[in-house]
Amino acid sequence: DYFRFGGESWNQPTDGGPREPLVDKTEHEMAGYVDFRQQIVRWLTFDAGVRLDRHSHVGTEWVPQAGFSFSLPRHMVLKVSAAKGFRYPTIRELYMFRPANPDLKPERLWSYELAFSQQMQDGRLSYGVNVFYIDGGNLIMRVPVDGRPMNVNTGRIRNAGAEVQAAYRIGAAWTVDANYSYLHMEQPVLAAPEHKLYAGALFTHGRWDVSTGVQYVAGLYTEVKVAGQGEYRTENFVLWNLRASFRAAKWLSVWVRGENLLAQRYEILAGFPMPRATVMAGVNMNF
């Protein structure tokens, strides 16, 4: 695949003054990839893949991944995998506004995961447990350099955690599900929570679809220390969301959605409060 992205930005004073150019940059990204899957024996499957990414500014990046899947008795599945991930710096981070730094390098990480899942009661009940470890580096963060903010590549991160999820189909109309995740961070990461718990329900009957869920988030870092500067700030909050839709005709459905219905005050990034209770409605037409 091939991507070409970028453009020109400027400030135009409202008093009719001269236009102030900000950035005029175009980047190119080209990649090729191959995926491979082989069933070695009836109960064992091997997956592998590799992607070669070429960025016009940053250079070339190899992105491999591999894993094994074990099909066990009683509809149990065990998976083990390792994969590399990366993120190129954006044009904004490289060139735009005061924190820009054209010398940024890509963020890189390796993730290792062990996952177990099972289906029971003819598929009505399913559950899974995952444990993972992440080893990364070159995270892009904004830090003070010579008295002014600048985007820089910071040090390594080592995170480990676990996830548990379950779903149960009560009947033809009702399904409930829940999940919990725990994240241990050797070095706290911005916008990452230590604990996240969710419980939800789905009702489907005739022309109606209604879903709702409550999510509890604890220890979400809205601000972190970088190079010994700044402070650690965390948020705890509960969110309740609801969505309902009614199919009025084959080609027409009406929907309403409510988010943060408990009107919680919270932030994901320090200094940027999230909306309180929000309600939206609309129609979908299919021809």
For each predicted feature, which ranges?
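Outer-membrane beta-barrel signature, preferentially recognizing the C-terminal barrel domain
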Residues: V77, S81-G137, V143-R169, V189-H195, ...
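Residue-level signature of outer-membrane beta-barrel architecture
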Residues: R37-Q38, L52, T60, F70-S71, ...
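Gram-negative outer-membrane beta-barrel transporters
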Residues: Q39-T45, V131-D135, V152-E223, S253-V254, ...
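Transmembrane beta-strands of outer-membrane beta-barrel pores
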Residues: Y2, S9-D15, M30, V50-S56, ...
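C-terminal beta-signal and adjacent terminal beta-strands/loops
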Residues: D135-G137, Y216-K225, L242-F287
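Transmembrane beta-strands of outer-membrane beta-barrel proteins
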Residues: F3-G7, F46-A48, P64, L78-V80, ...
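Residues that define the transmembrane beta-barrel architecture of outer-membrane proteins
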Residues: T26-M30, T60-W62, R108-Y112, R156-A160, ...
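Face-selective signature of the C-terminal outer-membrane beta-barrel domain
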Residues: D1-V58, S71, L125-V131, D177
